[in-house]
Curated annotation (Swiss-Prot):
Disulfide bonds: none annotated. Belongs to the MtrB family. It holds the Pfam family TrpBP. Transmembrane segments: none annotated. InterPro entries: MtrB, Trp_RNA-bd_attenuator-like_dom, Trp_RNA-bd_attenuator_dom. This is Transcription attenuation protein MtrB. Keywords: RNA-binding, Transcription, Transcription regulation.
């Protein structure tokens, strides 16, 4: 079990927000993706396999470091 795992809360502010998990290691790759509709919430966790999370679309993103709002699609 990965003990230093932070959680991230992502709430979609529009339909079609993409949340993509990226892997650790020499080659960064996509390993999981979710599509959220307006109002849906995803709680994600950094693990031994997930080193980054990419959010595409308008969403609130909350971490232990604070809250940020991503921009919507143009």
């Amino acid at each position: 079990m990965y003990t230093n795992s932070d959680f991230v809360v992502i709430k979609a502010l529009e339909d079609g927000v993409n949340v993509i998990g990226l892997t650790r290691g020499a080659d960064t790759r996509f390993h999981h993706s979710e599509k959220l509709d307006k109002g849906e919430v995803l709680i994600a966790q950094f693990t031994e396999h997930t080193s980054a999370i990419k959010v595409r679309g308008k969403a609130y993103i909350q971490t232990r470091h604070g809250v940020i709002e991503s921009e919507g699609k143009k």
